[in-house]
Amino acid sequence: MLFSDTKVRIIAKKTRETIVFFILFIIFAAVNDISIIICTDSEELPEFQASDFFHSSELFRIYKDTPRHRPVMVVARCADGRVAAHLLAVIRRRSWLVPPFLLWHCRIVGEGDYTGFEEHRDELFNLMMTELVKWMPVHVEYIELSNFTSKMFGYKTLSGLGFFAVNWLNIHNSLHSKSPEERISSKLLGRINGAIAKGVETHEVRTEEEFADFVHLLKAHNYFKPKRFIPDATFFRKVVESGCGKLLITTYNDTTIGCCAYAVSKGNAYLWYAAYLRKSYLRLYPAEVTVWNAIKTAYEDGCQHFCFLDVGLPYRANKLRDFILGYGGKPVSAFRWFRCRYKWLNRILTHVWSF
């Protein structure tokens, strides 16, 4: 026998689940007469209520005004004109010092917004992602999706579209049941209090000079880190103006030694970008103080959770992940999905990450 009875039953079960999923998907699309439109200009956007900042028309317009960014809003619309769901993707152009000197990649944070149609999330996500993959320009090297609310959300859809899953880790700090002081490790809190006693302080960016220091440190710190993409200063200015984000800087003797930017969406804070002068100010712990004050600011603003969008690469030895967990956060197993432009490379990576 090629397969044992157990394997045959597992394969049969998965096949039945897949068939049922697509039958429900076809019925839903037929009954609601769902059409998918792809918007690349602000004037094309239909009116809709967005509960998720990462998939809002506001962030779309911010990306539109930011150099090297091309936002794409995928909208699922009913026959009567109602917007059933929308998903924001952004195509970013990066410059490299080695070939290829220019690289385009598409980034999606979260699974989209399904306000009023939450029970049909799977079917709507399938429709939107299928159209987005068809539409995607040929020069885009890869597509990346991350930070889903559920690990298994979209598994069938993304696997069927040629995406491969990489085991990842999401970390968030709960702010609703205990104060940050009750969760942080005593050793880390001692370091932070010691640095504050020496004159280190964190506050929101208030002046143009502080904003310039924020942008300079962020870009200088991440210049030789190809994994991290830092947008133009326009992006950060407009995020603050939208009221959906905050910029913090940590200073010592009027010198900026740390900074971070976090966004607020659906009652949660998301640490988006950060930079620190760790080596130059080793005993002042700029990273520890900056992140700690960001968590405290989010707590004081009434946020329910403080989430980290970047916890480092999925390796067993990960200093960034260990550092973040020191604040008492909760690690949650997750997938991060990728799809490469070149089919042969995509097949190789799919096999590599399937082990």
Where are the model-predicted features located?
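Conserved acetyl-CoA binding element of GNAT-fold acetyltransferases
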Residues: 96-115, 169, 268-279
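Polybasic, lysine-rich low-complexity intrinsically disordered segments
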Residues: 7, 14-18
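Terminal substrate-recognition subdomain of acyl/acetyltransferases
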Residues: 23-32, 147-200, 310-355
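A conserved beta-strand-loop-helix scaffold within acyl/acetyltransferase catalytic domains
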Residues: 32-79, 89-95, 148, 152-166, ...
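Aromatic (often tryptophan-rich) hydrophobic motifs at membrane interfaces
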Residues: 75, 114, 130, 241-343
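A gly/proline- and charged-residue-enriched helix-loop-helix capping module
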Residues: 103-147
